[in-house]
Design a protein with these regions (language model features):
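Conserved tyrosine-mediated DNA breakage-rejoining catalytic core shared by Y-recombinases
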Residues: 17-104
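Short, basic (Lys/Arg/His-rich) helix/loop patches that form interaction surfaces
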Residues: 43, 104-160
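Short pre-functional
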Residues: 1-13, 29-32, 150-154
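Acidic donor-binding helix in nucleotide-sugar-dependent glycosyltransferases
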Residues: 14, 161
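A cytosolic small-molecule/anion-sensing beta-strand core signal
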Residues: 6, 19, 145
Length: 162
């Protein structure tokens, strides 16, 4: 996930809340929905992460299939969508790319379902990796986002899309 933060320029929560349908391998894009300020945007899916991300999604699909066999398999979707498409919560595309290991009670619906992974776990992993790399400064998911921006600007890439 940390490599996706850097490679895709994602914020920590954007990565955690990424859904399967938001990854377009054909065009090499990631669709970020409801990012900072509630804005949607599109970012690049790095080529060097495609195989790894594809394997992650295949593992999530298998987990979803297992959840369905055990009588679960729902995922949280916005209320308006749930009303319009009652079966959408069970569709694979709506499931998280990085789900929690265990199912839990969703406080909004009162149903047991798989939530997205925990942001604190990703934050700790980034911090631990920075310490192992010998970084004495504080490193976070936002630091990785700033690094990719700096590297792109240094290579003459225009970041604003009109």
């Amino acid at each position: 996930m940390a490599r996706l933060l850097y490679g895709g320029g994602l914020r920590l929560l954007e990565c955690i809340r990424l859904r399967i349908q938001d990854v377009d391998f054909g065009q090499g894009l990631i669709f970020v929905r409801g990012g900072k300020g509630g804005r949607d945007r599109t970012t690049l899916l790095p080529r060097n992460l495609r195989d790894e991300l594809q394997a992650q999604i295949e593992a999530v699909k298998a987990l979803h299939h297992q959840d369905l066999e055990e009588g679960f398999g729902d995922v949280y979707i916005p209320e308006a969508l749930a009303r319009k498409y009652p079966k959408a919560a069970r569709e694979t595309g709506w499931h998280w790319v990085f789900p929690a290991r265990a199912r839990s009670l969703d406080p909004r619906s009162g149903r047991v379902m798989r939530q997205p992974g925990r942001a604190s776990g990703l934050h700790k992993a980034v911090t631990r990796a920075a310490a192992q790399a010998g970084r004495d400064k504080r490193v976070s998911g936002q630091t990785l986002r700033h690094c990719v921006t700096t590297h792109l600007l240094a290579h003459g890439v225009h970041l604003r899309v009109r």
